Amino acid sequence: MTVKSKSRISHYEVLGVPVDASTDEIKLTYRKMLLTLHPDKSKTVPIDSTIKIRSGVSINQIQEAYRVLSNDQLRAAYNRALNDSNKLAGFNNFGDGLDEFNLDEFEFNEEKLEYVMTCPRCQSGGGFVLSEDMLEECIEDGLTESEEQGYQVLTQCTACSLWLKVNFFINDEEE
């Protein structure tokens, strides 16, 4: 499923509901929006002040948003596509604005002793490169360590402005 929108707003924004809204909340909001916009009904039904309709949103957009978000399978596919689209644009759902990856998601180059990953935004093949030496330096410089969480390093793509948090653990087999 591709996420297409002429106005570049999500179905959630069209309906004015949060991403975690229940199907019942979506249904109620949809009905209130239609009543508010309907030329015959809007005069006889009291206006609900909780309903905020974005400027420029059409009835067709509202109907399409409801069709997708009220169906569990379509909604799950839409959420995946929306998430993928946001990642390519450099956005994510974390409050700090950074995507999180585990070092296990990187490919290890044994010759260079480097972990390499393609950038999820610009698709640069060597977008993220972390050497073992760099990771060891980060540990020595006092990165936060926790038995459960391990270590974390921030790194920027070599080809674009995307920053990632990379989580990793130390393997103590050498001791």
Curated annotation (Swiss-Prot):
Per the record, GO CC terms? Answer: cytoplasm; nucleus
Q: What is known of its domains?
A: The DPH-type metal-binding (MB) domain can bind either zinc or iron ions.
Xref: Pfam families: DnaJ, Zn_ribbon_CSL
Tell me the Gene Ontology biological-process terms attached to this UniProt entry.
protein histidyl modification to diphthamide
Kindly give the CDD domains that the UniProt entry links to this protein.
Answer: DnaJ (cd06257)
UniProt keyword list: Cytoplasm, Iron, Metal-binding, Nucleus, Zinc
- List residues of the DPH-type MB domain: 97-169
Query: Ranges for the J domain?
Result: 10-82
Q: Which PROSITE patterns match?
A: DNAJ_2, DPH_MB
Locations listed in the record: Cytoplasm; Nucleus
Residues that hold Zn(2+) according to the record: C119, C122, C157, C160
This one is known as: Diphthamide biosynthesis protein 4
Q: Which family does it belong to?
A: Belongs to the DPH4 family.
Q: Name one GO molecular function term.
A: ferrous iron binding
What species does this protein belong to? Candida glabrata (strain ATCC 2001 / BCRC 20586 / JCM 3761 / NBRC 0622 / NRRL Y-65 / CBS 138) (Yeast)
Where on the tree of life does the source sit, at the highest rank?
A: Eukaryota
Named in its record, the pathway it takes part in is: Protein modification; peptidyl-diphthamide biosynthesis
**InterPro entries associated with the record:** DnaJ_domain (IPR001623), DPH_MB_dom (IPR007872), DPH_MB_sf (IPR036671), J_dom_sf (IPR036869)
Keyword Cell inner membrane applies? no
- Per its database record, what is this protein's job? Required for the first step of diphthamide biosynthesis, the transfer of 3-amino-3-carboxypropyl from S-adenosyl-L-methionine to a histidine residue. Diphthamide is a post-translational modification of histidine which occurs in elongation factor 2.
